[in-house]
Amino acid sequence: MNYQVLLYYKYMTIDDPEQFAQDHLAFCKAHHLKGRILVSTEGINGTLSGTKEETEQYMAHMHADERFKDMVFKIDEAEGHAFKKMHVRPRKEIVALDLEEDVDPRHTTGQYLSPVEFRKALEDDDTVIIDARNDYEFDLGHFRGAIRPNITRFRDLPDWIKENKALFADKKVVTYCTGGIRCEKFSGWLLKEGFEDIAQLHGGIATYGKDPETKGQYWDGKMYVFDDRISVDINEVEKTIIGKDWFDGKPCERYINCANPECNKQILVSEENEAKYLGACSYECAKHERNRYVQANNISDNEWQHRLTNFDDLHQHA
């Protein structure tokens, strides 16, 4: 594999995010990189892909900047680009929690746990493990015994915690996310809310999966990633599939977006059921006039109507 995917972040001060984004985009394009980078006055949050040579040059360039000299990059090998375009965008926050009173992780954040320390927390019955990711990320893969917040956006997590506070009161709470950036701010918010014993997996699931001692132990399923790969393996000790097909409930790790462009819901579905149900999550979406699956596969009107009847069988067996 001659390509690499980089995942990184750093909370620090960028005085002029708009100018930084403009200059950084030019640099990335000049080095043929592709990906998504968010910058704000609170720091940088990025994931990008390129050849090994190009990504090594990028990391060297960042480490040569005093502001980023100690920034940690999580590196995955890849067979090609994981993104189609290159975006660098200025934002209010590098991870959107939308709090009335913002949290600065440089001053307030949970205790950092190494992969080995986190594994011990997973083995401790008195510790509550909270997955700080979205529900569709959890459903593809998660740590054994972790609590699944019923959210589709990170900014909804604080409200969910408030509604379910009884689950965590007076307990040791450990949280985790993909690369660590969400937990930096989320664990800080928990401390501000009065929770006292708060810790986080330092470097996230991505770091845990590459640790030579833990080897991803106690992770079930695959880790969702926000690029063209969709998911990556984490557990090197044992392989489990926990995802379930949207239609028949069989083991599945294949995510697609609903073919209705006005829906776009992410569902786990086999290739067989994607074809059977026209790439849609429901009858309403399957019959939508702009169904992308129908268009991409040049399905005739007669065949379209025929496949719509598959939803009748689905309801009969529900």
Swiss-Prot record:
<dbReference type="InterPro" id="IPR040503">
    <property type="entry name" value="TRHO_N"/>
</dbReference>
<dbReference type="InterPro" id="IPR020936">
    <property type="entry name" value="TrhO"/>
</dbReference>
<protein>
    <recommendedName>
        <fullName>tRNA uridine(34) hydroxylase</fullName>
        <ecNumber>1.14.-.-</ecNumber>
    </recommendedName>
</protein>
<keyword id="KW-0560">Oxidoreductase</keyword>
<feature type="domain" description="Rhodanese">
    <location>
        <begin position="123"/>
        <end position="217"/>
    </location>
</feature>
<dbReference type="Pfam" id="PF17773">
    <property type="entry name" value="UPF0176_N"/>
</dbReference>
<dbReference type="InterPro" id="IPR022111">
    <property type="entry name" value="Rhodanese_C"/>
</dbReference>
<dbReference type="InterPro" id="IPR001763">
    <property type="entry name" value="Rhodanese-like_dom"/>
</dbReference>
<comment type="function">
    <text>Catalyzes oxygen-dependent 5-hydroxyuridine (ho5U) modification at position 34 in tRNAs.</text>
</comment>
<comment type="similarity">
    <text>Belongs to the TrhO family.</text>
</comment>
<dbReference type="InterPro" id="IPR036873">
    <property type="entry name" value="Rhodanese-like_dom_sf"/>
</dbReference>
<dbReference type="Pfam" id="PF12368">
    <property type="entry name" value="Rhodanese_C"/>
</dbReference>
<feature type="active site" description="Cysteine persulfide intermediate">
    <location>
        <position position="177"/>
    </location>
</feature>
<dbReference type="Pfam" id="PF00581">
    <property type="entry name" value="Rhodanese"/>
</dbReference>
<dbReference type="GO" id="GO:0016705">
    <property type="term" value="F:oxidoreductase activity, acting on paired donors, with incorporation or reduction of molecular oxygen"/>
</dbReference>
<keyword id="KW-0819">tRNA processing</keyword>
<dbReference type="GO" id="GO:0006400">
    <property type="term" value="P:tRNA modification"/>
</dbReference>
